[in-house]
Amino acid sequence: MTKFALVGDVGGTNARLALCDLASGEISRAKTYSGLDYPSLEAVVRVYLEEHQVTVNEGCIAIACPITGDWVAMTNHTWAFSIAEMKRNLGFAHLEIINDFTAVSMAIPMLKAEHLIQFGGSAPVAGKPIAVYGAGTGLGVAHLVHVDKRWVSLPGEGGHVDFAPNSEEEGIILEELRAELGHVSAERVLSGPGLVNLYRAIVKSDGRLPENLQPREVTERALADSCTDCRRALSLFCVIMGRFGGNLALTLGTFGGVYIAGGIVPRFLEFFKASGFRGGFEDKGRFKAYVQDIPVYLIVHENPGLLGSGAHLRQTLGQVL
């Protein structure tokens, strides 16, 4: 008889829940709920389990915020809860709450060739560290290492490291954003809001007044080639994505590959392919040769957060992935 566990991927707007076959890791019956419609994450879980008429004893839910102890307070939502209390209320024998990029990193060993698009480099080296990052509402970062037949995710808040410009144009962008924001992190340029920041800084540096655009509008105008400033912003976004990925590769020697997740890049995939992304990735001066062979992959799996939550739970329960 198939034994299922609950898995979830929760962001600032939506909560996506599904079932994971504990034997195979297969994800099924995924459903998305608006977080605004429910008073708590526990309430969403109860609705899901009731709708699907299923009883589970284990669960793993990935959330887009730091997880540092029993108390979880979401960054972009009002939900806050005790993991132990939620586990007790739901009657679970085991409940894991993990960072969203912990889940994405744990999905990587489960991905198949059709879930990936490669951008340069050679083949990954088995057993070597892996990096994963992704731009969305913010900039998520994690690393993954293989130790004693177990995958160990190393989450953090790498999206909040300093934005490090490496060209005259990027330096001008930094000065414009510093005057407006104070500290300028990588997330301030590598995210949906970050794309708008790039556009605004480009326009303001030319002494003009920027329009009040949304990230989608910047992307659409860039792809339609109807706005030079938007096209410059999107081009610069791709280059800086490359630089940041190259920095991750240098930091931990990620010869197992660098993986890009998040919902932004797939929206302009052809533009990204033709951009200066890989050039930015390899632009490491004396260490260009070090990163040249490191492959970069775009994850195109529909639900890497759910897949990785299931993988994390299965490994925690004693399975070898």
Curated annotation (Swiss-Prot):
GO terms for cellular component: cytosol. ATP binds at residues 8-13. One of its GO terms (molecular function) is ATP binding. It is found in: Cytoplasm. Its EC number is 2.7.1.2. It catalyses: D-glucose + ATP = D-glucose 6-phosphate + ADP + H(+). GO terms for biological process: glycolytic process. The keyword Nucleotidyltransferase does not apply. Keywords: ATP-binding, Cytoplasm, Glycolysis, Kinase, Nucleotide-binding, Transferase. Its main location: cytoplasm. It comes from the Bacteria. The keyword Nucleotide-binding applies. InterPro entries: ATPase_NBD, Bacterial_glucokinase, Glucokinase. HAMAP family: Glucokinase. Belongs to the bacterial glucokinase family. This is Glucokinase. The lineage of its organism: Bacteria, Pseudomonadati, Pseudomonadota, Gammaproteobacteria, Enterobacterales.
